[in-house]
Amino acid sequence: VPATIVRATAFFRSLVGQIDRVKAGKPFLLFGNGELSACKPISDRDLACFIVDQLDQHREGTVVRPIGGPGPAIAPAAQAAMLCSAANMPLKTRSLPPQMFDWFRWLLTPLALFSPDFAKRVEFLRIAKFYATESMLCWDHENQRYDADSTPEFGSDTLAAFYRAVLSGSESPPERGEHRLF
């Protein structure tokens, strides 16, 4: 049975966690130098259109379709600049060591042996470190690196325009659920 697995590189909704911090005049938090990871975020609307377009594709077997939004890959340092600009706030950042996730995991792991709640927190910290340090782009196996140029782009919605819409109130901030760092 033919199937298509769609793997979005990042979602706008996963990049809204620091809007309130920036609006309050607090620094945008970066891990390391803010260039450890990058992504090509895609809007829900553009992703929905991409998925619908896949329905017309005829193929045999299962295919995996990575997809990102339009434009160049965006690192957290560039996200900070976009968000501060959209909020009409000066660019202020604070760098945190990504190793902090390991430090907290080491502290909580003994408690995780006895508590499912702490076990969930330890797992969350493992996942958070991954997202803080690994790019959400296509992997170039030959060169052993993430490759923004080989990550397909789709749509027309940009993260900068999304930030402006949320900050102006013309678009509601998306629900992020329980798995959020900020």
Task: Report residues per predicted region.
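A hydrophobic C-terminal alpha-helical subdomain
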Residues: 99-182
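Context-gated lysine
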Residues: 23-26, 40, 92, 105, ...
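C-terminal "lid/loop" region of Rossmann-like NAD(P)-dependent oxidoreductases
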Residues: 64-65, 90-103, 125
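Short, polar/charged, Gly/Pro-enriched helix-capping and turn/loop motifs at alpha-helix termini
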Residues: 61, 93-94, 173-177
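A broad structural signal for alpha-helix termini and local helix breaks/kinks
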Residues: 83, 87, 91, 114-115, ...
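Oxidoreductase cofactor-interface core, primarily capturing Rossmann-like NAD(P)-dependent enzymes
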Residues: 1-89
